[in-house]
Protein backbone atom coordinates (compact mmCIF):
# COMPACT_ATOMS: atom_id res chain seq x y z
CA UNK A 1 0.00 0.00 0.00
CA UNK A 2 3.07 2.25 0.07
CA UNK A 3 2.38 3.80 3.49
CA UNK A 4 5.82 3.18 4.99
CA UNK A 5 7.12 6.29 6.78
CA UNK A 6 3.99 8.30 5.94
CA UNK A 7 2.80 10.43 8.84
CA UNK A 8 -0.87 10.01 9.74
CA UNK A 9 -2.74 12.12 12.29
CA UNK A 10 -5.91 10.51 13.65
CA UNK A 11 -8.39 12.38 15.85
CA UNK A 12 -10.31 10.26 18.33
CA UNK A 13 -7.67 7.59 17.88
CA UNK A 14 -7.58 6.28 21.44
CA UNK A 15 -10.65 4.03 21.10
CA UNK A 16 -13.10 2.40 18.70
CA UNK A 17 -12.67 2.93 14.96
CA UNK A 18 -9.86 5.39 15.60
CA UNK A 19 -7.81 2.90 17.59
CA UNK A 20 -8.37 0.23 14.95
CA UNK A 21 -7.03 2.72 12.41
CA UNK A 22 -4.00 3.41 14.61
CA UNK A 23 -3.14 -0.29 14.67
CA UNK A 24 -3.78 -0.70 10.95
CA UNK A 25 -1.45 2.15 9.98
CA UNK A 26 1.25 1.03 12.41
CA UNK A 27 1.09 -2.40 10.77
CA UNK A 28 1.83 -0.66 7.47
CA UNK A 29 4.92 0.97 9.02
CA UNK A 30 3.39 4.46 9.04
CA UNK A 31 4.08 7.06 11.70
CA UNK A 32 0.89 7.76 13.66
CA UNK A 33 -0.05 10.76 15.78
CA UNK A 34 -3.20 10.40 17.87
CA UNK A 35 -5.07 13.56 18.86
CA UNK A 36 -7.66 12.64 21.47
CA UNK A 37 -9.31 14.48 24.35
CA UNK A 38 -8.98 11.47 26.69
CA UNK A 39 -5.47 11.73 28.08
CA UNK A 40 -5.75 8.58 30.21
CA UNK A 41 -6.84 6.44 27.25
CA UNK A 42 -4.17 7.98 25.07
CA UNK A 43 -1.40 7.24 27.53
CA UNK A 44 -2.71 3.69 28.03
CA UNK A 45 -2.61 3.21 24.26
CA UNK A 46 0.99 4.40 24.12
CA UNK A 47 1.99 1.92 26.84
CA UNK A 48 0.11 -0.93 25.20
CA UNK A 49 1.47 -0.41 21.69
CA UNK A 50 5.04 0.40 22.82
CA UNK A 51 5.95 1.63 19.34
CA UNK A 52 8.33 4.49 18.50
CA UNK A 53 6.19 5.28 15.47
CA UNK A 54 3.25 6.23 17.71
CA UNK A 55 2.81 9.63 19.37
CA UNK A 56 -0.06 11.00 21.45
CA UNK A 57 -1.10 14.62 21.91
CA UNK A 58 -4.04 15.46 24.18
CA UNK A 59 -6.38 17.56 22.03
CA UNK A 60 -9.78 19.18 22.35
CA UNK A 61 -10.73 19.55 18.70
CA UNK A 62 -13.31 22.22 19.50
CA UNK A 63 -10.41 24.49 20.53
CA UNK A 64 -8.57 26.07 17.61
CA UNK A 65 -5.16 26.53 19.28
CA UNK A 66 -5.29 22.88 20.38
CA UNK A 67 -5.96 21.78 16.80
CA UNK A 68 -3.10 23.90 15.52
CA UNK A 69 -0.85 22.39 18.18
CA UNK A 70 -1.79 18.85 17.13
CA UNK A 71 -0.76 19.58 13.53
CA UNK A 72 2.51 21.18 14.65
CA UNK A 73 3.20 18.23 16.96
CA UNK A 74 2.93 15.81 14.05
CA UNK A 75 5.27 17.90 11.92
CA UNK A 76 7.77 18.37 14.75
CA UNK A 77 7.74 14.70 15.78
CA UNK A 78 7.95 13.04 12.38
CA UNK A 79 8.97 15.80 9.99
CA UNK A 80 5.73 16.22 8.09
CA UNK A 81 2.05 15.41 7.71
CA UNK A 82 0.79 13.20 4.91
CA UNK A 83 -2.68 12.12 6.07
CA UNK A 84 -5.27 13.65 8.39
CA UNK A 85 -8.11 11.39 9.52
CA UNK A 86 -10.94 13.38 11.09
CA UNK A 87 -12.42 10.56 13.13
CA UNK A 88 -13.37 12.05 16.52
CA UNK A 89 -17.11 12.18 17.10
CA UNK A 90 -19.87 11.97 19.69
CA UNK A 91 -23.60 11.38 19.74
CA UNK A 92 -26.36 12.32 22.17
CA UNK A 93 -29.63 10.41 21.97
CA UNK A 94 -32.75 12.59 22.25
CA UNK A 95 -35.64 13.41 19.91
CA UNK A 96 -35.36 16.95 18.62
CA UNK A 97 -38.23 18.30 20.73
CA UNK A 98 -36.50 17.09 23.90
CA UNK A 99 -32.90 17.96 23.05
CA UNK A 100 -31.21 20.74 24.98
CA UNK A 101 -29.53 23.48 22.96
CA UNK A 102 -26.30 22.82 24.84
CA UNK A 103 -26.35 19.18 23.70
CA UNK A 104 -27.10 20.18 20.10
CA UNK A 105 -24.17 22.60 20.13
CA UNK A 106 -21.85 20.08 21.77
CA UNK A 107 -22.44 17.47 19.06
CA UNK A 108 -22.02 19.94 16.21
CA UNK A 109 -18.93 21.48 17.79
CA UNK A 110 -17.16 18.13 18.03
CA UNK A 111 -18.40 16.42 14.87
CA UNK A 112 -18.47 19.35 12.47
CA UNK A 113 -16.53 22.30 13.85
CA UNK A 114 -13.74 20.03 15.07
CA UNK A 115 -13.37 18.61 11.58
CA UNK A 116 -13.24 22.14 10.16
CA UNK A 117 -10.57 23.30 12.61
CA UNK A 118 -8.32 20.28 12.14
CA UNK A 119 -8.68 20.46 8.36
CA UNK A 120 -8.05 24.20 8.28
CA UNK A 121 -4.65 23.88 9.92
CA UNK A 122 -3.73 20.64 8.18
CA UNK A 123 -4.48 22.21 4.80
CA UNK A 124 -2.26 25.18 5.57
CA UNK A 125 0.64 22.76 5.93
CA UNK A 126 -0.38 20.50 3.04
CA UNK A 127 -0.75 23.40 0.60
CA UNK A 128 2.79 24.51 1.41
CA UNK A 129 4.18 21.00 1.06
CA UNK A 130 2.30 20.34 -2.18
CA UNK A 131 0.71 17.07 -1.12
CA UNK A 132 -1.72 15.60 1.37
CA UNK A 133 -4.70 13.42 2.06
CA UNK A 134 -7.72 14.07 4.29
CA UNK A 135 -10.13 11.30 5.28
CA UNK A 136 -13.31 12.13 7.16
CA UNK A 137 -15.31 9.64 9.20
CA UNK A 138 -18.90 10.38 8.28
CA UNK A 139 -21.78 7.98 8.97
CA UNK A 140 -24.75 6.36 7.35
CA UNK A 141 -26.57 8.89 9.55
CA UNK A 142 -25.32 11.56 7.18
CA UNK A 143 -27.03 9.78 4.29
CA UNK A 144 -30.20 8.36 5.87
CA UNK A 145 -31.07 9.82 9.27
CA UNK A 146 -31.06 7.49 12.26
CA UNK A 147 -33.98 7.95 14.71
CA UNK A 148 -33.56 10.08 17.85
CA UNK A 149 -30.07 11.47 17.11
CA UNK A 150 -30.92 14.64 15.14
CA UNK A 151 -27.76 16.57 16.02
CA UNK A 152 -25.58 13.61 15.05
CA UNK A 153 -27.40 13.21 11.73
CA UNK A 154 -27.10 16.93 10.99
CA UNK A 155 -23.41 16.98 11.86
CA UNK A 156 -22.61 13.96 9.72
CA UNK A 157 -24.63 15.37 6.84
CA UNK A 158 -22.30 18.35 7.03
CA UNK A 159 -19.25 16.11 7.05
CA UNK A 160 -20.50 14.44 3.89
CA UNK A 161 -20.49 17.73 1.99
CA UNK A 162 -16.79 17.54 1.24
CA UNK A 163 -17.10 19.72 -1.85
CA UNK A 164 -18.50 22.59 0.19
CA UNK A 165 -15.76 22.34 2.80
CA UNK A 166 -12.69 21.57 0.74
CA UNK A 167 -13.28 22.59 -2.89
CA UNK A 168 -11.56 19.46 -4.32
CA UNK A 169 -11.30 21.14 -7.73
CA UNK A 170 -8.93 23.69 -6.18
CA UNK A 171 -6.88 21.70 -3.70
CA UNK A 172 -6.46 18.79 -6.12
CA UNK A 173 -4.12 21.06 -8.07
CA UNK A 174 -1.84 20.86 -5.05
CA UNK A 175 -1.92 17.04 -4.99
CA UNK A 176 -4.32 16.97 -2.03
CA UNK A 177 -7.20 14.50 -1.94
CA UNK A 178 -10.25 14.51 0.35
CA UNK A 179 -12.61 11.57 0.81
CA UNK A 180 -14.84 10.14 3.51
CA UNK A 181 -16.08 6.82 4.81
CA UNK A 182 -19.67 6.33 5.99
CA UNK A 183 -19.86 3.48 8.51
CA UNK A 184 -23.05 1.76 9.52
CA UNK A 185 -23.51 0.37 13.03
CA UNK A 186 -20.06 -0.59 14.28
CA UNK A 187 -19.32 -2.68 17.37
CA UNK A 188 -17.39 -0.12 19.43
CA UNK A 189 -17.23 0.67 23.16
CA UNK A 190 -19.03 3.97 22.49
CA UNK A 191 -21.90 2.18 20.77
CA UNK A 192 -22.05 -0.47 23.48
CA UNK A 193 -22.49 2.26 26.07
CA UNK A 194 -25.22 3.91 24.00
CA UNK A 195 -26.98 0.57 23.42
CA UNK A 196 -27.23 -0.12 27.15
CA UNK A 197 -28.31 3.42 28.03
CA UNK A 198 -31.07 3.64 25.42
CA UNK A 199 -32.40 0.09 25.01
CA UNK A 200 -33.82 -2.68 27.15
CA UNK A 201 -32.22 -6.12 27.44
CA UNK A 202 -28.70 -7.49 27.72
CA UNK A 203 -25.92 -6.14 25.54
CA UNK A 204 -25.90 -9.35 23.51
CA UNK A 205 -29.66 -9.16 22.94
CA UNK A 206 -29.45 -5.53 21.87
CA UNK A 207 -26.61 -6.24 19.45
CA UNK A 208 -28.57 -9.06 17.84
CA UNK A 209 -31.54 -6.75 17.37
CA UNK A 210 -29.40 -3.94 15.94
CA UNK A 211 -27.78 -6.37 13.52
CA UNK A 212 -31.13 -7.11 11.90
CA UNK A 213 -31.25 -3.70 10.20
CA UNK A 214 -28.81 -4.65 7.43
CA UNK A 215 -28.63 -7.53 4.93
CA UNK A 216 -25.40 -8.93 6.37
CA UNK A 217 -27.21 -9.40 9.70
CA UNK A 218 -24.27 -8.38 11.86
CA UNK A 219 -22.59 -5.29 13.24
CA UNK A 220 -19.48 -3.97 11.58
CA UNK A 221 -16.03 -4.32 13.12
CA UNK A 222 -13.78 -1.30 13.70
CA UNK A 223 -11.06 -3.05 11.70
CA UNK A 224 -13.33 -3.14 8.65
CA UNK A 225 -13.62 0.64 8.67
CA UNK A 226 -9.90 1.00 9.31
CA UNK A 227 -9.27 -1.05 6.16
CA UNK A 228 -11.28 1.47 4.13
CA UNK A 229 -9.16 4.23 5.63
CA UNK A 230 -5.99 2.39 4.60
CA UNK A 231 -7.29 2.20 1.05
CA UNK A 232 -8.19 5.90 0.95
CA UNK A 233 -4.81 6.87 2.39
CA UNK A 234 -2.87 4.78 -0.09
CA UNK A 235 -1.99 5.10 -3.76
CA UNK A 236 -4.59 2.43 -4.48
CA UNK A 237 -7.20 5.21 -4.33
CA UNK A 238 -5.11 7.77 -6.21
CA UNK A 239 -7.93 8.64 -8.65
CA UNK A 240 -10.44 9.36 -5.88
CA UNK A 241 -11.24 12.73 -4.35
CA UNK A 242 -14.53 14.20 -3.14
CA UNK A 243 -15.88 10.66 -2.79
CA UNK A 244 -17.72 8.81 -0.04
CA UNK A 245 -17.44 5.08 0.62
CA UNK A 246 -20.35 3.52 2.47
CA UNK A 247 -19.49 0.52 4.65
CA UNK A 248 -22.78 -0.38 6.30
CA UNK A 249 -23.50 -4.05 5.68
CA UNK A 250 -25.91 -3.09 2.90
CA UNK A 251 -28.18 -0.91 5.06
CA UNK A 252 -28.54 1.97 2.59
CA UNK A 253 -28.91 -0.40 -0.37
CA UNK A 254 -32.23 -1.78 0.87
Swiss-Prot record:
* Keyword Repressor listed: no
GO BP field: antibiotic biosynthetic process
Positions binding substrate in this chain are: 139
Enzyme Commission numbers on file = 1.1.1.385
The answer to keyword Oxidoreductase applying to this record is yes
| Annotated metabolic or biological route of this protein | Antibiotic biosynthesis; bacilysin biosynthesis
Q: What class of enzyme is it?
A: oxidoreductase
Disulfide bonding pattern of the chain: none
* A single MF term (Gene Ontology): oxidoreductase activity
* Catalytic activity field: L-dihydroanticapsin + NAD(+) = L-anticapsin + NADH + H(+)
Which residues make up the binding site for NAD(+)?
9-31
User: What's the superkingdom here?
Assistant: Bacteria
Database matches in CDD domains: SDR_c
Q: Which InterPro entries match?
A: NAD(P)-bd_dom_sf, SDR_fam
Q: Which UniProt keywords apply?
A: Antibiotic biosynthesis, NAD, Oxidoreductase
Q: Where is the active site?
A: 152 (proton acceptor)
Q: What does this protein do?
A: Part of the bacABCDEFG operon responsible for the biosynthesis of bacilysin, an irreversible inactivator of the glutaminase domain of glucosamine synthetase. Catalyzes the dehydrogenation of the C7-hydroxyl group in the 4S-tetrahydrotyrosine (4S-H4Tyr) to yield anticapsin (epoxycyclohexanonyl-Ala).
Q: Which NCBIfam families match?
A: anticapsin_BacC (NF033173), PRK07231.1 (NF005559)
Per the record, the similarity remark reads: Belongs to the short-chain dehydrogenases/reductases (SDR) family.
Descriptive protein name? Dihydroanticapsin 7-dehydrogenase
In its UniProt entry, the species of origin is given as Bacillus amyloliquefaciens (Bacillus velezensis)
Gene this protein is translated from: bacC
Amino acid sequence: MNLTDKTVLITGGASGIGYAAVQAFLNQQANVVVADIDEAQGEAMIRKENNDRLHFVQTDITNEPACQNAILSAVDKFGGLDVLINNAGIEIVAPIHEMELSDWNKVLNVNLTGMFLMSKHALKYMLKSGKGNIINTCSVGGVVAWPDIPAYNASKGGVLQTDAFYRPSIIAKHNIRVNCVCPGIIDTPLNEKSFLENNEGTLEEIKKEKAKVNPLLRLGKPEEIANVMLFLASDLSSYMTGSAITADGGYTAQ
